[in-house]
Every structure is written in structure tokens, then in C-alpha cells.
Amino acid sequence: MNIIYEKRKNNYSAIDKFDSTKNNILLLGKADTHEERRNVINPNGTHNAAMLYGPNSELCQAYNQCLSITQECNIFTVNCRTYSDYLDTIDSVLHYNFSYVVPMGLKLDDTFFNSYTNKYEYYIDYFMYLIEEYQCYTTIIMTSDHASDFESMDKFLDHNNKILREYFTHTTKDNDNYALYSKNGSDIIFVMNNLQGVKYANAILASQLSIENYTSYPQDVDYKTYYDIYKTDVKNTSCAYHKFNHLTNKSSIDNLVNMRLYEDVYKNALIDTMIKSIFRMLDFDKYRGRLYNAYIKLQIQNTAKTTLENMKGQYFKNYEIKNIGFVKTADAAGYIYIELLIMPYGFMEYINVVMEV
């Protein structure tokens, strides 16, 4: 897959090869220039990012911070100067199946007026709708106001809890929103904005998660936290946070959950992102629309086995192909599915995973 954008300088590639098997990050933020507005590019280094966006811009600084963590050019960027730029960009890039999308200029509680529905909507509701429409395996990582904006830790925590509480109240009042959230809440991660010297903690979290090592927990980062937050401070909330270790002088990511409605294994953000990685790697496009029979079933099984064997030991401990079947939805229509049993690292039991082919 190629991401093509208009070339205006000669120091960076006009066409970047996009490897969908990697955990790629898309940073959406504001530059100090109008260069490459709403265009998806990979700066391929800090010099090009500074040239494109301005060295002091929030987009360039976030890119540099992420690159220092991932140490590889898996970070794509978009210059979004207005709120409408975010909507236009998200609508046009989700089909690329980025692992993590980070809309830095948007907060979890931000809303916009949708002229199609004639009402105000949360951006994250619209993002979940698009993920459903495109059937992609992307995780949106959101944050909120920075901890330095608050007089005390209690006020900072109260603010974040209020945001989540109001969103959940809004969701449960609308049947359509509730149905969407019930199905796709795991596609959203909310992290507290509590790192010193970092404007957007969601960009840092995306970098931590993008390092492909499912055998261990995400690596700590070389940042201090503004407040010392503990597990008891975020009890029963769908909110990840960074915790500073005074011995190592680094910060870990704790309470790493997504915003899934149900309290089950799939609310674990590491499990969810591991499953999405499996789905991205399992390429069944050539079987879609095909007449289901014993031969097609065998081909799907062989394709899945080859892919899963290559992933075993890096993404998960073990797996089983439980079933491959066909679900009839109409007289001449239906879909093929594959059911897997996956044993993640850190677990003693298999978890059930079902993918529509």
C-alpha cells in the first residue's frame, strides 16, 4: 500500500511505503506552517519534520518525542490547522488501517455540530462510526487538559472523572450511541495528560504501544509526571495514566484499559491491540465474495495457519484454529468467519477471537 501526497520539497520522499503489518502511528496536530495541510506524510526524521512544520510546532515536537521512543520511522503525520481538518482527515485515512491514530488537538469531551444528523456529537462517537463503516482495526488514543492547568491533583482527577461520567451518561441516553459504543468502545483509549514536558500524553502512549513486543509490558519512558497518581485514584474508571518511578526516574503506563463498556478480558488494551494486529496480518481479501465450500475452507485454514505460526512466540504464546464456517444472512448472501483460540503472554488460558473473513 502506498500513501501518496503532493510533493513541495525535495528533502523527503513523495511516496512512502506503508507496511500494514507494522504498528504504525498517525499523529494529527497543528503545525506552524501551512505545508502539507491534510496530507498524510512520513517525515522520515526530525530534520524534515522541523522543515515541514516548524521546529517549535506541537506537531513537530510530538513527532520528535515519539521517534525518540520508537526509534523507527513508523510515525506518520498530518497538519490539521482547524477542527474540520480533523474530521476530513480521519474520514479519508482510516482505510489505511493505522494501528494508532492520535488526534492531538481534540480532547475526549470535544463535540461538533453534525449537519447530517442535525445535532451535536462527540468526536469519538463519529470516529467509532467511521471505524465501523471502514471495518478497520484502528485504536484512537485520546487525552484531555494537561495536569499543569489545574491547581491540585484532586481537581485534575475530578476533571477527568467528570469527562468520563458525562460521556457515559450521554451514551446511555441514546439507543444508537449506546449500540455503537457497546460494539466499538474498545477502539478508544483515554489517557490522563500528566507528563512533564509533554503536551499530549496520548502521543507518548501510542509510541509505547507501537513497539512490537507483546511478550512484555510497554517500556517506561524518560519523563516525569506532574502529579503522582495511584491505582486507587482511578479505581473503576476507563482511564490509563502514567506513573513515575522514583528509583528508575522513568514513567510507566498503568491501568492500561480501553473504553470498552464491558469489564472483560477484551477491555485490556494490550489484549485488544494484539487481536487487532492478528486481524491486520490475516489477509483474507481474496476469499471475500467467493462461494464457500470445502476447498475455500481449506485454503483459509492454510493461510491462517501460515500467518499464525509466524506470529507465534512474538505476539502470543499459542493458538488453535477452532472453527471456520459460513453465516447465511439472506437467500444468496452471507459471510465466512474464522474462530481462533489465542493464549496471550501473561495469561494461562485461551481467549476466544472471531474474525469475519
Model-flagged regions — what are they?
Residues 1-52, 57, 63-300, 307, ...:
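A glycine- and small-residue-enriched flexible loop/hinge signal that marks low-structured segments
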Residues 325-357:
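C-terminal edge-of-domain segments
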